[in-house]
């Protein structure tokens, strides 16, 4: 993807006969739009709260497992070796299950974050296309592909305002 962008830029600037002199090229900062749009902020807040809640839940479970382990260690000399082994294996299974659950929740939150990013990009595409056609713009580049540019050709704030009007929130459930 990175090489494709570089190739496009090289072709764009190496063959000026293919581009009219009145080409209107602008850029937007996609990262800023994703992070500062109302829908993006709401999605980030939702995911942050979900992660915080899940972390609290898992911390409580971890504390219970540690207490169970300490109890088992204190009972080691009291109970039979077979019973100790049996309880130790049960505790290990609980620990493994706990770790798997924690990983599944982390993966779920990551997937929801990616889904939110895709939904924002999907909503942004028609907005950009409409804005480009209304303002006779030839090309809009992402800020991270632009090395140096004048601030006058930055459409980020304008596009951000339009996106905030058209997209209030994102469904993550």
List each model region and its residues.
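Long low-complexity intrinsically disordered regions
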Residues: 2-4, 173
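Sec-dependent N-terminal signal peptides
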Residues: 4-14
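Sec/Tat signal peptide C-region and signal peptidase I cleavage site
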Residues: 17-22
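A short, glycine/Asx- and small/polar-enriched loop/turn
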Residues: 152-155
